[in-house]
């Protein structure tokens, strides 16, 4: 019994020290798309109930996110209001489908490249700051 206990403690010590020494990218841990609430909503079945009003299951992901930010316990906070507004803007500014081919990154000017980098950052879609910076760079494209 003593050998089992000693070997168990030794294994736990090695395993815990290995986990503690492991480096991790915090952006991978806080990415909103990986949150359980987002995972459950994306895999949930569509509502079969027909009615006049839209249900949560029938809304687009931006509709759901905007409503979630508005309805949270601290939904009146500036951060949640900014995020809800950002989702509402994204719903309005969805580009129409086209057959155009996008410019390659090497053909873009510095502002176009900066806008793309801000939008494609690990937390670019969920960060208000990255979206604002991307919009700022895009406005400078038309000015130049």
From Swiss-Prot:
Task of the protein: Required for the copper-inducible expression of copper resistance. Activated by the two-component regulatory system CusS/CusR.
GO CC entries: periplasmic space
Basic and acidic residues composition bias: residue spans: 108-121
GO molecular function: metal ion binding
Biased composition (Polar residues): 96-107, 122-132
Keywords, comma-separated and alphabetical: Copper, Metal-binding, Periplasm, Plasmid, Signal
Listed name of the protein: Probable copper-binding protein PcoE
Key word Metal-binding present: yes
Induction comment from the UniProt entry of this chain: By copper.
Main location: periplasm
Annotated signal sequence range: 1-20
Statement: the UniProt record of this protein carries the keyword Signal: yes
Disordered: annotated segments: 86-144
Taxonomic lineage of the native organism: Bacteria, Pseudomonadati, Pseudomonadota, Gammaproteobacteria, Enterobacterales
Compartments, record wording: Periplasm
Similarity field: To S.typhimurium SilE.
